[in-house]
Regions:
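Metal-cofactor-dependent catalytic cores
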Residues: 1-176
């Protein structure tokens, strides 16, 4: 762990390994060591669109996703309800509301205003039709839960099933 002024000493503090998820849409789901959901999915196209709006592009690691998908349009993940990758099916729970941790450069430890300043101009609750969250929240990526255990490998095709709400397109979609 790097800091600007000193060495940081750390130790593992045991905590309850499993927590019940806060959103009822996660039907019986549990998480451990994560903020609120076991997995975060973001598309490369969404990051590319975001980076086209800022003067200094940010790397994907600033958003800390577990799964990164390619071959779809920007923010296509906003419309997915379930997806299958490899042997595993995932349930899309809700858009990920972003916190100040995303403003920290992981290489240097310095904090800035991005990505929250730019995301707040076009990714608020009303812009992404988020089922929960405050009007001041900004969203980037989707919180997802796996429905069963299975193997996911780099390069696997992703099959997405869309939400069937008026603001979303219906259907079944394959990419990659």
């Amino acid at each position: 762990l790097r800091t600007h002024h000193a060495t940081v000493r750390m130790r593992l503090v045991r905590a309850q390994v499993r927590r019940v998820l806060r959103v009822s849409a996660a039907a019986g789901g549990q998480t451990a060591f994560s903020d609120g959901f076991p997995l975060l999915l973001i598309s490369e196209a969404s990051l590319s669109d975001f980076n086209s709006r800022v003067s200094s592009p940010l790397p994907m690691n600033r958003f800390r996703p577990n799964l990164v998908v390619a071959g779809c349009g920007a923010y296509a993940e906003d419309q997915w309800r379930t997806l299958r990758i490899g042997e595993t099916t995932f349930h899309v729970v809700k858009p990920c509301s972003r916190c100040k941790i995303t403003t920290t450069d992981q290489e240097t430890g310095y904090r800035g205003e991005e990505p929250l300043t730019t995301l707040s101009t076009y990714r608020r609750k009303q812009d992404v039709k988020a089922p929960c969250g405050d009007a001041v929240d900004v969203f980037f990526g989707q919180n997802i839960c796996h429905q069963q255990q299975g193997r996911v490998s780099k390069g696997d095709a992703v099959y997405a099933n869309f939400w069937q709400y008026p603001w979303y397109l219906g259907g079944y979609w394959h990419f990659c």
